Amino acid sequence: MPTPDPFVSATASLLFPGLLARAQATDEGAWKPFRAGVDILALYSTPDGHSAALLRYQPGAVVAHHLHVGFEHVLIISGTQIDPRGEHRAGTLVVNPPGSDHQVTSPGGCVVLAIWERPVEFTGN
């Protein structure tokens, strides 16, 4: 799958054929380091802050405490992700509203599709 243009118009239509296969691929390709133990494959971003990406958590990865200033939608594609609301398994859609905050872990590793209305603000290490 070609690397998408990182910035797109808010009115552009985008298609990502083979996205689930790409999420499960073990080759590094377009995956980049994001946080310790977490890689990111950016799908798109717009000048006003909307963005989406695949995130690949290695076993034991922790994403530091952060605040959501816009909606975040997270679809767990494989594995399990844990936040203060509980353990979220593959197939679960997690919606974090503006003003919510949390820390996320994945003891066994996982891959998620994350869609952000606005960038998150990291408040912890």
Describe the role of every protein-language-model region.
Residues 1-49, 125:
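A short, N-terminal "cap"/entry segment at the start of jelly-roll beta-barrel domains
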Residues 35-68, 87, 97-101:
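Conserved short histidine dyad/triad with adjacent acidic residue
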Residues 39-42, 75, 103, 111:
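Residues located in well-ordered beta-strands
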Residues 50-54, 74, 110-111:
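Structural motif
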Residues 58-61, 68-83, 90:
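Glycine- and acidic-residue-biased ligand/ion/polar-headgroup-sensing regions
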Residues 62, 92-93, 111:
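Residue-level marker of beta-strand positions
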Residues 82-106:
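Short acidic-glycine-tyrosine-enriched beta hairpin
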Residues 98-123:
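Ligand-binding loop in jelly-roll beta-barrel domains
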